[in-house]
A protein has these predicted regions:
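N-terminal subdomain of nucleotide-sugar transferases
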Residues: 1-61, 93-94
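A short, charged, and often flexible helix/loop element on the N-terminal side
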Residues: 60-87, 139-146
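Conserved catalytic-core segment of nucleotide-activated headgroup transferases in glycan assembly
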Residues: 187, 191-220
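Membrane-proximal helix-turn-helix segments that form the acceptor-binding/catalytic region
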Residues: 29, 85-92, 126-130, 139-167
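Short N-terminal targeting/anchoring amphipathic segment
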Residues: 88-107, 118-120
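Short hydrophobic "strand-cap" motifs at the C-terminus of beta-strands
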Residues: 8, 170, 210-213
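Active-site proximal beta-strand in glycosyltransferases
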Residues: 114-137
Length: 220
């Protein structure tokens, strides 16, 4: 069994404070516990590098997103903006397996720049549907156009990429969607720290925020 693994993450997975980073972070914790050496590759935009990640990884690399990818008319922005040449160079230093987290990190797979590599994809959801929902709820006309355009590009992109490698879906619904795209799809539930409850002792007043309220879909 190979004890080394590259993991590509579309964001910095610490702090684990929203849905897109909870599963990636606690996967790092679990892999560390069973002796897997992880080479973590993160894209930065609004989140800074985190020393905490070094506790669980052999190496941690950070890459800036390319905002000029907005000019692309053929590829989704969430994918094209994560096409760092430095990342491709790091992946080429060895032949370790690769776990791509989120359709966001699949640019080099799509471009067939990783031949003869063992690769798995862990999509966070069906992104084309997610962006369609964002477009339907958006009031700002420019953002609405962007979300609608992104959804259209993602729909064809997801269909093509999902047939290239095995899919590790987060939900049974997503598993079924990718199976309908002729993908080899498997269901692995979200990884969370279920072994313990992290809560302050005693009683008090609490406010529960279920989801990121800066996203229109969560406000709805």
């Amino acid at each position: 069994m190979d004890k080394n693994l590259h993991i590509l993450c579309p964001d910095v997975p610490w702090p684990a404070d929203y849905g897109g980073v909870i599963d990636p972070f606690y996967l790092l914790v679990q892999l560390k516990a069973v002796g897997i050496q992880v080479y973590l590759h993160c894209f930065t935009q609004n989140r800074a590098p985190q020393k905490e990640l070094e506790k669980y990884c052999k190496e941690v690399h950070y890459y800036r997103r390319d905002k000029t990818a907005l000019l692309s008319n053929t590829l989704p922005y969430i994918v094209k903006s994560r096409s760092s040449k430095k990342l491709l160079q790091e992946l080429g230093k060895n032949n370790y397996p690769i776990l791509m987290q989120g359709i966001h990190t699949t640019y080099f797979l799509y471009k067939k720049l990783l031949p003869n590599r063992k690769i798995l994809l862990r999509p966070f959801n069906v992104e084309s549907t997610y962006y369609q929902q964002l477009s339907a709820l958006e009031i700002n006309p420019f953002k609405k156009y962007f979300f609608k355009r992104e959804s259209r590009l993602l729909k064809s992109y997801e269909k093509e990429v999902s047939t290239m490698i095995p899919i590790l879906a987060l939900s049974q619904t997503d598993k079924q969607f990718f199976e309908e795209q002729n993908a080899r799809s498997y269901f692995i539930p979200v990884i969370i720290p279920w072994q313990e409850v992290s809560i302050l002792p005693g009683t008090g007043n609490y406010c529960l925020y279920h989801g990121n309220l800066s996203v229109n879909e969560n406000q709805k």
